[in-house]
């Protein structure tokens, strides 16, 4: 299906684009990856300026925006979190209107999703959600690209997400399922199932029904015949919860070699949006080893595609900027 121009479009949630437009972005990202491998740089963003507002820590996402910008000839400017105090001395609206006159796009990572919406409303330039408390759409673009590279398709693929079913990744993956046509199984304890309100919002705001969303409590049933087992850390950035209570809830959902075998498929892959606790090489994991959400043998094993996902963050972000920025 022919798509209309994506110029000056935002990516605040996966619902900003329809299936054809999202598929086009994935195909463009795959092409960007090929060109990068061949060291071909077309400078599609030459002499443009990209603004980076990162109010939460960021590794892969921020560097992906930086590298993608420089590859295509753009300048990327970080605004340090300490320099931005929305609502203290300057409103989001006023800040956005100035930035919109100086820059050609905004990458925003923060807490309240409403801040991203305000930036998009008043800046007049594309705003890309690099993660908020409720959505993480740029990660799902990389995930879908990784799945398509692995299986040659995304439609009909079964992704089993194991862990905290209420986080921003699950929400974005769920919208992505209805858009792209993959089947998402959310496998979590009852206390961490997505709320009825969140699920209702996903279905209400997503017109497509190309894939499915199912919720499981029992691991074996949820992962059976899954093409992908996906997990994330058990406590999200900025989340204030009892570590002991969260471990007690999610320890049965730790991704292990045994869980991978429960799929009954030899070609099941493992995915993780990173950063991950998979060994004792971090202070947090050494202090609380029971917080490790995936066995190191799975994370480092032949079924793992976590570093493909990490690389594909850059290619999908590059495609997103090339398609949406007005030159």
Swiss-Prot record:
Family annotation (InterPro entries): Asp/Orn_carbamoyltranf_P-bd, Asp/Orn_carbamoylTrfase, Asp/Orn_carbamoylTrfase_sf, Asp_carbamoyltransf_Asp/Orn-bd, Orn/put_carbamltrans, OTCase_ArgI
Pathway(s) where this gene product acts: Amino-acid biosynthesis; L-arginine biosynthesis; L-arginine from L-ornithine and carbamoyl phosphate: step 1/3
Signal peptide: none
Main location: cytoplasm
Induction: By N-sulfodiaminophosphinyl, the inorganic moiety of phaseolotoxin, at 18 degrees Celsius.
Alphabetical GO biological process terms: arginine biosynthetic process via ornithine; citrulline biosynthetic process; L-arginine biosynthetic process
Field pH dependence: Optimum pH is 8.4.
Amino-acid biosynthesis among keywords: yes
Its EC number(s): 2.1.3.3
Catalysed reaction equations from the record: carbamoyl phosphate + L-ornithine = L-citrulline + phosphate + H(+)
Pfam families: OTCace, OTCace_N
UniProt keyword terms in alphabetical order: Amino-acid biosynthesis, Arginine biosynthesis, Cytoplasm, Transferase, Virulence
Binding site for L-ornithine: 168, 232, 236-237
GO cellular component, as recorded: cytoplasm
Subcellular localization: Cytoplasm
Amino acids binding carbamoyl phosphate: 109, 136-139, 273-274, 313
Enzyme class: transferase
Annotated PANTHER family: ORNITHINE CARBAMOYLTRANSFERASE, ORNITHINE CARBAMOYLTRANSFERASE, MITOCHONDRIAL
HAMAP family: OTCase
Record function comment: Plays an important role in the survival and pathogenicity of P.syringae. Phaseolotoxin is a virulence factor that inhibits the catalysis of the host OTCase. Phaseolotoxin-producing bacteria do not suffer autointoxication because they possess the anabolic OTCase ArgK which can function even in the presence of phaseolotoxin. Reversibly catalyzes the transfer of the carbamoyl group from carbamoyl phosphate (CP) to the N(epsilon) atom of ornithine (ORN) to produce L-citrulline, which is a substrate for argininosuccinate synthetase, the enzyme involved in the final step in arginine biosynthesis.
Note: This enzyme is insensitive to phaseolotoxin, a potent inhibitor of OTCase.
Description of how the protein assembles with itself and partners: Homotrimer.
Protein's UniProt name: Ornithine carbamoyltransferase 2, anabolic
Organism: Pseudomonas savastanoi pv. phaseolicola
Gene name as annotated: argK
């Amino acid at each position: 299906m022919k798509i209309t121009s994506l110029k000056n479009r935002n990516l605040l949630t996966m619902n900003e684009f329809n299936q054809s437009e999202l598929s086009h972005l994935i195909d463009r990202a795959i092409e960007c990856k090929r060109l990068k491998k061949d060291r071909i740089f077309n400078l599609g963003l030459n002499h443009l300026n990209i603004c980076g507002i990162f109010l939460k820590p960021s590794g892969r996402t921020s560097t992906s925006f930086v590298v993608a910008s420089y590859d295509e000839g753009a300048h990327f400017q970080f605004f340090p979190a300490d320099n931005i105090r929305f609502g203290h001395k300057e409103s989001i609206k006023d800040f956005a209107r100035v930035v919109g006159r100086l820059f050609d796009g905004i990458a925003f990572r923060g807490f309240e999703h409403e801040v991203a919406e305000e930036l998009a409303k008043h800046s007049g330039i594309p705003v890309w959600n690099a993660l908020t408390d409720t959505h993480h759409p740029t990660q799902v673009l990389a995930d879908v690209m990784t799945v398509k590279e692995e299986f040659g398709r995304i439609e009909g693929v079964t992704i089993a997400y194991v862990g905290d079913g209420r986080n921003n990744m699950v929400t974005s993956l769920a919208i992505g399922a209805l858009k792209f046509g993959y089947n998402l199984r959310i496998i979590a304890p009852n206390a961490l199932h997505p709320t009825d309100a969140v699920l209702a919002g996903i279905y209400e705001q997503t017109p497509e029904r190309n894939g499915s969303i199912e919720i499981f409590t029992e691991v074996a049933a949820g992962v059976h015949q899954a093409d992908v087992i996906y997990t994330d850390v058990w406590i999200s950035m900025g989340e204030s919860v009892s570590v002991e209570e969260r471990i007690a809830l999610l320890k049965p959902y730790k991704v292990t070699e045994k869980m991978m075998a429960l799929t009954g498929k030899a070609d099941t892959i493992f995915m993780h949006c990173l950063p991950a606790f998979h060994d004792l090489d971090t202070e947090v994991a050494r202090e609380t080893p029971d917080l490790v959400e995936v066995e190191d043998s799975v994370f480092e094993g032949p079924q793992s595609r976590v570093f493909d996902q990490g690389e594909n963050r850059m290619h999908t972000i590059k495609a997103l900027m090339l398609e949406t920025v007005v030159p």
